[in-house]
Amino acid sequence: MINEQELQQLVETISLESFGRPFLHQAKINRRLKTTGGRYQLSDHHLEFNPLFLKEENLHYLPGIIKHELVHYHLHLAGLGYQHKDRDFKLLLKKVGGSRYAPRLEESKRSRWHYRCRQCGQDYWRQRQ
């Protein structure tokens, strides 16, 4: 698993190589991210990444995810359309070869709870993360 310093260096390198522009903010690991590969913060321009994609077995997904978040970053700072629906976003994402979606990873054990109504016998399943 790579640490935050290595992540910062990787983001800075990919930004220069793929976009020709420096990344001047922070790249962080956010353990609360579960269903997405990363997130661009509009308020402070920092990038956050899901730690599942920083594990050795998932590192091959990371450059595509970093490029995706950097597309948001560079377009927003340039005053262009940075949202997924915007044409500018779609064109730049395709140009740099970023991931459109983060792949779904096998998560650590999830609990499934089974409930049965005592009156009617109806079964209910609850899945906890």
Regions found by a protein language model. Name each.
Residues 69:
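Walker B catalytic acidic pair
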Residues 1-64, 73-129:
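Active-site-proximal or metal-binding-adjacent scaffold patches in catalytic folds
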